[in-house]
């Protein structure tokens, strides 16, 4: 089984200690991104996985490529010489809490278009994993996402769609319409309970999962935070799946 994960990654600066960002003397440099996080997790489980996106031809872009490859992820990227890799700053105002600021306007990832995709690799993959973040970044990234889904649908590649709503990027109404369009062409849909309500208008997990299935996918997973998830797959209600406990890292 091979997987392609499509979506933007960002350079990440994390405050080295708890406190207001302007009072923290040092920050740790890394990177983050919903789709590349999935890619890393799969690679650690031994699954062949490719991360596909567009990066700035800069130090952050090179850092992201290098660290992904160090994790065993194949990076199918194109480099933009005129746009930067996006950046996010993460502060820890109190123990157990965090706040994130994004600097992604005009980023290389926001300039992604269908021409930057390795369509052949998508067609050859078993699974294409996407999120709603890509659709929110602009017309070019949305067109790229649509082209990737078209290629997957045409070749029998399973489409995994995690809603991953970002309210800072677009309005609820615009997002909900786009999510329904994408979900209708996906095979598996993941959504938090608040995202599932945005997508379907339903409030209970079982009703949310059923309404997602009605859009077209065969599997729906409604994420319930510490309580786990509610899953509906191929007509069978798997019901509540317990969550696993963890700790901040």
Language-model features: locations:
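Glycine/threonine-rich flexible loop motifs
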Residues: 134-143, 171-172, 197-201
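Conserved N-terminal subdomain of the carbohydrate kinase-like
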Residues: 48-132, 157
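Structural recognition of alpha->loop->beta junctions
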Residues: 73, 173-198
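Catalytic-core regions built around general acid/base machinery
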Residues: 140-155, 177-185
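Conserved phosphate-binding/catalytic region of the ribokinase-like
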Residues: 1-3, 150-154, 201-249
């Amino acid at each position: 089984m091979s997987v392609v994960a499509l979506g933007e990654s960002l350079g990440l600066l994390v405050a080295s200690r708890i406190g207001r960002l302007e009072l923290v003397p040092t920050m740790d440099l890394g990177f983050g991104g919903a789709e590349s996080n999935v890619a890393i997790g799969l690679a650690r489980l031994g699954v062949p996985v490719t991360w596909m996106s567009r990066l700035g031809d800069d130090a952050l872009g090179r850092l992201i490529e290098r660290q992904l490859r160090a994790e065993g992820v194949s990076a199918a990227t194109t480099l933009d010489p005129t746009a930067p890799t996006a950046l996010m700053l993460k502060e820890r105002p109190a123990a157990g809490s965090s706040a994130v600021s994004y600097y992604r306007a005009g980023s290389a990832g926001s300039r992604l278009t269908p021409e930057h995709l390795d369509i052949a690799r998508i067609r050859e993959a078993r699974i294409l994993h996407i999120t709603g973040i890509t659709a929110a970044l602009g017309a070019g990234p949305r067109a790229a996402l649509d082209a990737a889904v078209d290629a997957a649908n045409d070749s029998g590649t399973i489409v995994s769609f995690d809603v991953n709503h970002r309210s800072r990027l677009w309005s609820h109404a615009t997002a909900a319409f786009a999510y329904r369009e994408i979900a209708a062409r996906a095979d598996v849909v993941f959504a938090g309970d608040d995202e599932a309500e945005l997508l379907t208008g339903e409030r209970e997990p079982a009703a949310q999962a059923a309404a997602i299935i009605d859009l077209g996918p065969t599997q729906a997973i409604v994420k319930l935070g510490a309580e786990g998830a509610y899953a509906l797959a191929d007509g069978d209600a798997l019901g509540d799946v317990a969550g696993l406990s963890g700790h901040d890292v």
